């Protein structure tokens, strides 16, 4: 009880104590507690905020992870789809492979069936052949495993049979040999012919304006005649014709021949004596056949040569000289004759001990000589016909031009001196018929111009042909006669080719200096065909020909080139289109005068003679070759000089166009380059024709030196010719 009272007393005292007013110390403690509570609340709020931030970050991460997972799932699905597609493709490939294998199997089956059919056919042919063979002939088995053993056994048995038969001295030996007999054919009942149309007679060859058509009409007439004759021959031959039949008969032979026959049949090797006997037995037949084949080949080869020459002449007369020049190359003719000689050499090696060889050799040589002579005569006749027609045509054209000039002389005096173009509104502008003084001189009959006096050439350098921007290269070439000069050079080249071939065949081929002559001819050819110029070309800068007309045209060329160098810079004062048009006209005019000079040189070269100091020298052949090469160098220098002059004028025009800088400058420069290239090609293409022309100059000198002394004609110096 006392304890409970004490507790109650303590509780009351504590309550009383709590109800008492606070002291200062108590107040301070309260303040500290309040501050601590506030700080704790702030820290709690901060921690809450941090927790919320962390939670937000975690949520963002979770969102990103979920997005990535979705993307990964999509990629996995895509990969699965790709794998499915690959599996499908593999299945398709398997199906295709299976189909291919099935096709291969079917093809193999078909091939096997074809092979079986072929084997059956072979068996049938073998059985048919065995009917004609010897009764004792061995049938080769077709079983794959036992073929070799069966063949060996059967060969042994056959050997024994042959030995037994040979041992009997009184036995006669027979072999079966195939023989061809002839019998008359049975007459065939010809059906009654339906009323045929009357045969059209073969057209007679008619000379047309084109020589190629004339040759083709001859070919048609010949072919129609041949077909008609062939038909008549076939109709006649059907009545009493014979057919050949192969039969077998028994022939008695000697013991050696019988043994050799069976050894050949069994495929056994023959002895050396039997080989030599066999060669001697068959040698006569082989030799005769070889001779006949050689003669036949020679005849056909010659016929081909003549046919080629006729075709070649037809193309020559229809298409011009250039095609003929390519086809009439000496190397082509040499190739044909070389083939015939090879055939004769092979025949000679085979049948050198035969008497028939001498006869065949004479026949072949006579045949070749006559065929080549015929070829040359055909070519020369065709050439002479064509050249005379061309001369007549050119003379008629000159007469017509002279008449037109005389008729137009009076109205031209009333007009201005500057030439004009045709100004018809419906037709394109073309050059007038009036030409400059530069093209009045041509190369016809240049051999007769040695005594002509030199003329003073006057050039109207301000002459115009085309209007600005209307330059036409083809019309300009015709205006300045460029095509005519080129045709003259090509014509001389073809004529020189034919003459060179004739001299080579008749004179050079039988002489002892053939090898040295061939060296000079090859050197001339390489000189013109080589793109690089020789080092000593500058030493040939002066012309030394016997034709005085060459030096007149050379003077004319130099005067025009000097005036053109003064005239070209003045084109800068005109419009760029007009200046280019005038410049191109002058380039083509310079080209025409250069071609006139080259053509005149070409026409005088075949008649050029070596000076006396060359022909009278002991070492005549070498000196003549050096003289011919020096002349060729002079021509090559002239061609090179004209080419460089054209390039110089073109370069001056290029500088004028570049200095003006117009929108059309690039186009105009391109046109200038194209036309300059065309003009240069006209000059450079003449080098190919000069190969044959210079070769015939050299061959003429060699021919005269071999046949006998000729009257020496010294080459005049240039100073003497000018005086």
From Swiss-Prot:
Residues 45-129, 149-166 have a biased composition (Basic and acidic residues). Residues 1-166, 181-212, 268-289, 391-455 are annotated as: Disordered. GO terms for molecular function: transcription coactivator activity. The keyword Coiled coil applies. It comes from the Eukaryota. The keyword Coiled coil applies. Residues 53-173 form a coiled coil. Residues 30-42, 397-455 have a biased composition (Low complexity). This is Uncharacterized protein DDB_G0279979. One of its GO terms (biological process) is positive regulation of transcription by RNA polymerase II. The lineage of its organism: Eukaryota, Amoebozoa, Evosea, Eumycetozoa, Dictyostelia. Keywords: Coiled coil. One of its GO terms (cellular component) is mediator complex. Residues 272-288 have a biased composition (Acidic residues). Residues 1-12, 181-190 have a biased composition (Basic residues). Residues 193-204 have a biased composition (Pro residues). Disulfide bonds: none annotated.
